[in-house]
Design a protein with these regions (language model features):
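Patatin-like phospholipase
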Residues: 1-42, 50-230
């Protein structure tokens, strides 16, 4: 795999603020001389995949992630479609990567979201990176859906949390998935944490069949992590 990176694909699953665990996986692969030829991600995994695909090293991404204030009170909205605006994510992406297009990444990249009106999987391989990440990380109920071309898009975890099938469609011959759904849960202390726990529990109950498509599934130890830890 090290000699021909174009056969290796890496799918990074969602997990709210557990997403920083993906960086340890990326670093471990680098230490083994492995660099993916294809990247795709859902939710927090989409963010990690995007920064890596645009050339950031894992430790650099970790330092950048510390500056994200995703659940800021100033993002509160009175919309009937969600408690918070997800605009902060779009601004965050553009601050560190600029107003880039997905197709300009140094590693072929795909971002997974879902159409909340139809239940369809929506895969971004071109277009605004910031918009795609906003859609993919838009946890239903917590954030307002992201409007893209007349569609209401939300967190891709509801359709494919570890998007192995997308990797296969991109051309990867060896597909590795990273599942962040094994970390347990903490007692919630706010409405947002109740919603995050409920969403994650529902996704975790459906993830096992997605992993069957992978050649390898990595499940980092996440005991003690909260969905709102950074």
């Amino acid at each position: 795999m090290a000699e021909d990176p174009h056969i290796l694909g890496l799918a990074l699953g969602g997990g709210a603020f557990r997403g920083t665990a993906h960086l340890g996986v990326l670093k471990a692969l680098e230490e083994e001389g492995l660099r993916p030829g294809f990247l795709c991600g859902t939710s927090a995994g989409a963010m990690a995949a995007a920064f890596y695909a645009f050339g950031m090293a894992p430790e650099e991404i970790r330092n950048v992630a510390r500056n994200l204030r995703w659940l800021k009170a100033t993002n509160f909205t009175f919309s009937k479609l969600g408690l918070l605006s997800n605009n902060e994510i779009g601004k965050f992406i553009e601050k560190y990567l600029g107003e880039v297009q997905i197709e300009d990444s140094s590693i072929p990249l795909a971002i997974v979201a879902a159409d909340i009106s139809t239940g369809e999987k929506v895969v971004f391989k071109t277009g605004s990176l910031a918009t795609a990440i906003m859609a993919s990380t838009c946890i239903p109920g917590v954030f307002m859906p992201t409007q893209v071309d007349g569609r209401m898009l939300v967190d891709g975890a509801i359709v494919e949390n570890v998007p192995i099938k997308v990797l296969q469609e991109m051309g990867a011959k060896v597909c590795v998935g990273v599942d962040l759904g094994s970390g347990g849960y903490r007692q919630p202390e706010s409405l947002v944490e109740v919603l995050l726990n409920a969403f994650s529990i529902a996704i975790d109950r459906t993830i096992h069949h997605q992993g069957e498509k992978a050649d390898v599934i990595i499940k980092p130890s996440l005991a003690g992590y909260s969905l709102t830890d950074s």
